């Protein structure tokens, strides 16, 4: 059996996180291994679980998504997760900064 793609969701909107997790769990090849409610928790969970994919909201308490990218960039991880940024706003300046810090994709939330 093929290994599942592990996903960590970092978003302070609990309803959105649960809806997204529910959708991802229905995919045969994906497994949600954690849901962080703020940026500090996201960094800790990424360091401890090293997911294949990290879905990171830009606007979160304690540490925003840009801060999460900065912190995980400084961690000595054996493998950096593919980071996909989520945001309700699509500002070019923020998008460019996220990509510069290693985000692979930037998705504007509905």
Where are the regions that the model predicts?
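Two-component/phosphorelay signaling modules centered on CheY-like receiver
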Residues: 14-34
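Acidic catalytic/metal-coordinating carboxylates
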Residues: 38-41, 64-70
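Conserved phosphotransfer cores of two-component systems
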Residues: 47-49, 73-80, 101
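Active-site beta3 strand of CheY-like receiver
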Residues: 49-55
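Conserved sequence signature across two-component system core domains
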Residues: 10-11, 36, 54
């Amino acid at each position: 059996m093929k290994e599942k793609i592990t996903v960590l969701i970092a978003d302070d909107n609990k309803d959105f996180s649960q809806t997204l997790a529910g959708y991802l769990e229905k995919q045969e090849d994906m497994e949600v291994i954690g849901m962080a409610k703020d940026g500090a928790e996201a960094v800790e969970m990424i360091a401890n679980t090293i997911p294949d994919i990290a879905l990171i909201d830009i606007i979160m308490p304690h540490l925003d998504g840009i801060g999460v990218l900065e912190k995980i960039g400084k961690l000595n991880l054996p493998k950096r997760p593919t980071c996909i940024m989520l945001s309700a706003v699509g500002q070019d300046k923020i998008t460019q900064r996220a990509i510069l810090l290693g985000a692979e994709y930037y998705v504007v939330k509905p």
